């Protein structure tokens, strides 16, 4: 099985031919992968942020940045500046290692997995994938989970259209649904 990096070197000529690029620098490539999660219960339970951080470190292999509330919301007992989430940006080799794990280990572990939806592209060819439960990642011990936590994975590319981004991710091994 080829890794994502090796698949990219094989995909460059195919993308150049498919989209009729005149210059090899026009071929879309991966820029970064951003993993983020909201920890809303951190307002009332300070330990929730620590456990979420430990889970993100296990999944990404890198310490996350704490995201804070921009403004106060009285209904949620939230004040501006309070920690409400975590995010990690992966680039370079860590990005490729994470995508290998995501495409070939994690996604096949999802129950009743039929492929990722084709509709999650933005207008610039970036793809966002959401998980309702982070326990599908092999680094997370299912017995130690206090509460299932959702997270988002945003794959940022240099593609200009959703079609370019889809073709790039398809050639890299992203399992899209058939419909």
From Swiss-Prot:
Protein name per Swiss-Prot or TrEMBL: Large ribosomal subunit protein uL5
Summary of the function given for this chain in its UniProt record: This is one of the proteins that bind and probably mediate the attachment of the 5S RNA into the large ribosomal subunit, where it forms part of the central protuberance. In the 70S ribosome it contacts protein S13 of the 30S subunit (bridge B1b), connecting the 2 subunits; this bridge is implicated in subunit movement. Contacts the P site tRNA; the 5S rRNA and some of its associated proteins might help stabilize positioning of ribosome-bound tRNAs.
Keyword Membrane: no
Self-association state and partner proteins as the record states: Part of the 50S ribosomal subunit; part of the 5S rRNA/L5/L18/L25 subcomplex. Contacts the 5S rRNA and the P site tRNA. Forms a bridge to the 30S subunit in the 70S ribosome.
Gene: rplE
Gene3D superfamilies per UniProt: 3.30.1440.10
Organism: Dehalococcoides mccartyi (strain ATCC BAA-2100 / JCM 16839 / KCTC 5957 / BAV1)
Keyword Heme: no
Highest taxon listed in the record's lineage: Bacteria
Keywords: Ribonucleoprotein, Ribosomal protein, RNA-binding, rRNA-binding, tRNA-binding
One of the record's GO cellular component terms: ribosome
InterPro entries: Ribosomal_uL5 (IPR002132), Ribosomal_uL5_bac-type (IPR020930), Ribosomal_uL5_C (IPR031309), Ribosomal_uL5_CS (IPR020929), Ribosomal_uL5_dom_sf (IPR022803), Ribosomal_uL5_N (IPR031310)
């Amino acid at each position: 099985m080829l890794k994502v990096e090796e698949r990219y070197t094989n995909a460059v000529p195919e993308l150049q031919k498919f989209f009729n690029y005149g210059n090899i620098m026009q071929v879309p490539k991966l820029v970064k992968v951003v993993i983020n999660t909201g920890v809303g219960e951190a307002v009332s339970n300070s330990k929730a942020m620590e456990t979420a951080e430990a889970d993100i470190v296990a999944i990404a292999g890198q310490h996350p940045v704490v995201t804070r509330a921009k403004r106060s919301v009285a209904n949620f007992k939230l004040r501006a500046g309070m920690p409400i989430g975590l995010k990690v940006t992966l680039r370079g080799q860590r990005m490729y290692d994470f995508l290998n794990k995501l495409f070939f280990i994690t996604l096949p572990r999802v129950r009743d997995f039929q492929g990722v939806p084709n509709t999650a592209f933005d207008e610039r060819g970036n793809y966002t994938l959401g998980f309702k439960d982070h326990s599908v990642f092999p680094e997370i011990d299912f017995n130690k989970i206090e509460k299932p936590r959702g997270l988002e994975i945003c794959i940022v590319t240099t593609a200009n259209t959703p079609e370019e981004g889809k073709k790039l991710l398809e050639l890299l091994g992203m399992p899209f649904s058939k419909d």
